[in-house]
Structure formats: structure tokens, C-alpha cells
Amino acid sequence: MKLSRSSGKEQSGTVFGSSPKRRLTLKTPPSLALLFVGALLANAFVNSHAQAPGPSSGTVLASGLNDPRGLAFGPDGALYIADSGTGGTNSTVGTCTQGLPPIGPYKGGPSAKILKLDTNGKLTTVASGLPSFINLIGDLMGVSDVAFLHDKLYALIGGGGCSHGNPDLPNGIVRVNLNNGKWDYITDLSLFYMEHPAAYPDDADFEPDGAPYSMIVHNDRLFVVESNHGTITATSTDGATTKIIDMSLSQGHIIPTSVAANNDNLYVGNLTPFPIFSQRARVITLSRNLSFVDTTPGLATKAADLSKFRVANSRAGFTTIVSLKFGTDGLLYALELSDTPGGYPNPGDGKVLRLNADGTIQTVVSGLTLPGGMTFGPDNALYITNFGDSGPGKGQILRMVVEQ
């Protein structure tokens, strides 16, 4: 599913190029989105601008970012960063379904971008003019994640779509030309989510354009976790997109935010709805290598499902997971937004946890404030986006050394 070419080129802060002229046709129920914070975190419930304790150790490599989210190292050794932008002033009220107060309606604009932190510590803009939104409580979303496949840069768009004030720039995946900063959509995920609805969406927390939050490369495809509908999709480089699993069918509204791959299995982490309850988040194992066939009426395993990803295992004990990564030690690391029990995220309560081989869960980094994403670098250090939901100009990139 390929859209017409769209490009964004930075030149003195101006974006040049055209965007695909298209109008989304809504096929979903009216939005009652009172808790999009479940997928996007929430400034309404946290004073993230307050003074917070710093992380337990580490170095600030860059600052002044706009709610940075996912990040990935490129073949050139540089770190590429998803920047949410600052939203915009465009309103689509009366045009399509809107999020309800106190979260919506949203206002959009082409202010999101992709940043590059090179090996000398210089921060530059790689691509700009990408869709971004701001809601009534100040949450920002634009570029959600970045990944490299066959040395080409792909970016996941989470701030697009008509319901977010960007009717001509949907949520989806774009391919970025690193030579000139131009970008093209390879798939329209806004339209895909509407044409392939989840089995059990939460009507009180529904986003028509979805909330694609994280993306990884697995088996030569781009796997995307959508947090609001609870679906995981896979997209090939030609734009062909398929639904891998509908998590809502077996798990309900758990707000999956992250996915990691190990061999042929996928590992999904979830945020859980707010208010926060400690250790309610899980790591869910998905596998296609399951021999179990359920014959219970109404629950019977269909023949077509035997070769698909199914839930194989689940491990609780985590809180508000926003990213999962495997380390060089083969162990799984989880980035937590905040472990404040019985409430909402607090500055300084973000952590990185490690699931050890004996099953224990160990804190390896603490003192983070609303982290948005993490990745391991070629030096085996952890790179984390800190202040990932704190407003324009507050975001940081941290480098943390953890013993593996």
C-alpha cells in the first residue's frame, strides 16, 4: 500500500516538497478518547517540569529535543533519534472524528523530525517536515521510532492522521533518503488500522488513526506495535503490510508499547492503563512454534492459526514498559516509564530493568524522567531518550554503562 511521493528537506528551517493529497475515510466508531495518555503518557497527570533526581549514572550526550522517543544506530556509527516535534495549529474539527476533552481535539503540523548524533557528538537534522500533533494537555507525538533495514533508514510516524490534525499525512512508515533528507511513505497505517480493526478496541480510549509506538527489524520486515488497538503488523520494503497478531483478542486493552525479537520469537511489553499499579505490566512471548491445539468449543484453535504468532508465555513483575531490548548478554532489558504505584508518572521514577537467567528482575538504571526509548550501542552501552514526554526543548539523550 504505497502513497504518492512526499518529501521534506531542511533548508534554513523551511520544508520544501509536496505531501500526498488524500482524505481518510473513517470506518471506525466515533472516538471517545479520554485516555490516549495510556499510549502517549500524560503531562496532565505529572509535573515533569519539576526538579527531578537525575539518573543513577551516565552522560548527557544531547539536550533541547522535543519529546524524543525511539532511537537506533546507523551503519555509519551515528545515533538516529525520533523527535516528536512541536505539533501545529491545524485543526480538523468537523472534518473527521476527534478525540474528546480533556485530551482532544488535537492540532497538527509538519514539525516532527529525525535527528542524527554523529560520532563526534554533533547533533543535526536528517529529515524534517514530518507530521506532529499536540493535544489539549500538551502531549506531543510525531516520529515514534526509527530503524535501519538493509542500510536504509525507516521512520515510524505516530503523529499523523486526520484525527490528529494532519489529514494529508497519515500514521505510517516512511523511508528516508540520507543524502538529501527526502522521505516517502511506504505504507499508510492509519488506513490499514481502519480497514483491519481490532477485535476488542476500548471505546473509552479509542484512536481512529491508531497509536503506532515502536518498530523493529525482524526477518527482513518492519514490525510495528500499535498501542491503542493492540495490534502488531509487519511491513516489507515494498510496503506490503499484514497483521501479525491482534493482542486485544486474547489480552484485552493492555496497551502494548514495545517488541523485541530473539530467534523466531517475539517479546511484547505493555504499559497498562493508568492509574499505575506496580508489577502489573508483562513481557508476553509470541511464537509460531506451538504444537498445542485447543479443542474447547468457542476457543478451538483454527487450522489457519497454527502457523501464526500465538501467545506462548507471559512474565509479570514489570511496571509501565515502554521499550524492550536484548543485550549482548542475551538477557532482556525493559525500560519503565515510572513505577509510582497507585497514581501517575513521576519525574525521576523511570528505570531500566533486566530479566536475569534465574528469573529475577534487577534494576540496572534508575532516576529517569519519562523515558521514551532505548537501544544498545556498538560499545554495548545503553542509549536512552530521557524527558520523552516533557514538552518542547526538554528532551535528552543519555548514555548509560550497565554491567553485562
Where are the regions that the model predicts?
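Short, solvent-exposed loop/turn segments at conserved positions within beta-propeller repeat blades
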Residues: 90-110, 163-169, 227-228, 275-281, ...
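Beta-rich, blade/repeat-based domains predominating
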Residues: 64-76, 111, 132-152, 193-222, ...
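Short loop/turn segments that connect beta-strands within beta-propeller blades
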Residues: 118-122, 177-181, 236-240, 287-291, ...
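A short loop-to-beta-strand structural motif that recurs across blades of beta-propeller domains
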Residues: 110-115, 171-174, 231-234, 281-285, ...
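Surface-exposed loop and turn segments in beta-propeller and other repeat-based domains
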Residues: 122-138, 181-207, 245-251, 296-314
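Residue-level signature of beta-propeller blades and closely related beta-rich strand-turn architectures
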Residues: 85, 159-161, 228, 272, ...
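Residue position within the beta-strands of beta-propeller blades
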Residues: 80-83, 155-157, 224, 267-269, ...
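Blade-level signature of beta-propeller repeat domains, shared across WD40, Kelch, NHL, RCC1
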Residues: 375-404
